Amino acid sequence: MATSSGSCLIISLLVVVVAAALSASTASAQLSSTFYDTSCPSAMSTISSGVNSAVAQQARVGASLLRLHFHDCFIQGCDASILLNDTSGEQTQPPNLTLNPRAFDVVNSIKAQVEAACPGVVSCADILAVAARDGVVALGGPSWTVLLGRRDSTGSFPSQTSDLPPPTSSLQALLAAYSKKNLDATDMVALSGAHTIGQAQCSSFNGHIYNDTNINAAFATSLKANCPMSGGSSLAPLDTMTPTVFGNDYYKNLLSQKGLLHSDQELFNNGSTDSTVSNFASSSAAFTSAFTAAMVKMGNLGPLTGTSGQIRLTCWKLNSS
């Protein structure tokens, strides 16, 4: 009897897993790069213009938009839940406290412009996905086809911010966090290459520069000048070579033990991803190809489609019922 019950339980669990996978696959299949071609033909150019203007004023915004999209997708899927100004929501959780406020402002501003042209048509989730792509392009990086048709969540998911891997993560923890989202080791290393642009706060890397041994000594010393052992909010570039230009220098830094975050250097620390880092460091084309493919995969995580969710009229709050 115990064996029979166990078999039934296993079968039931398999049915649930398969059903969930099919549901996610079906939702992704409903996305299309031409989704707004008829309903809001000016949407893509409006987003691009808004991002280019913002990046021209502050280059860091390009990286901030990319990070915002990543944080959105890793929490319950790419549904703009991260944009909600809920006093107890995702924005209040530790992993999101260092998100650049300017990125939220840019998305909200673009949304207002899109709403003026096409009321109630383009979702905040899609605007953020496209803005992340355009931010990379504005900093000299590659473009990729963003599939569209996501809808916006009707709630925030603060408890699921634990899905975001912290900067203190080991390689094993990183691989597990990405695997949970059906992203493999190559995807993980490629998406980490987003750190070729942007900055991090001292509190995110103080442990690495004071406690770790797998860091270039001179590099660590230079960082300590503006980052005390106790931490703080002072900023340092994630890529010391070309901090405002998207490229593969991030991986070259890792080969020299100049990864800013503990989790960065874990990618090249006598582990299973060393060869991938070396490949990306030596071939910009290999990195670009892997990065764009991984961005498409990440952008398709758990989208709300059809009649699920809503098209928010303002990104930071839910529509009035």
Swiss-Prot record:
Pfam families: peroxidase (PF00141). Ca(2+) 2 binds at T196, D239, T242, G247. Its cofactor is heme b; Ca(2+). It catalyses: 2 a phenolic donor + H2O2 = 2 a phenolic radical donor + 2 H2O. Binds 1 heme b (iron(II)-protoporphyrin IX) group per subunit. The record marks R67 as: Transition state stabilizer. Its main location: secreted. GO terms for cellular component: extracellular region. Residues 1-29 form the signal peptide. It comes from the Eukaryota. It is found in: Secreted. Belongs to the peroxidase family. Classical plant (class III) peroxidase subfamily. This is Peroxidase 42. It comes from Zea mays (Maize). The gene is PER42.
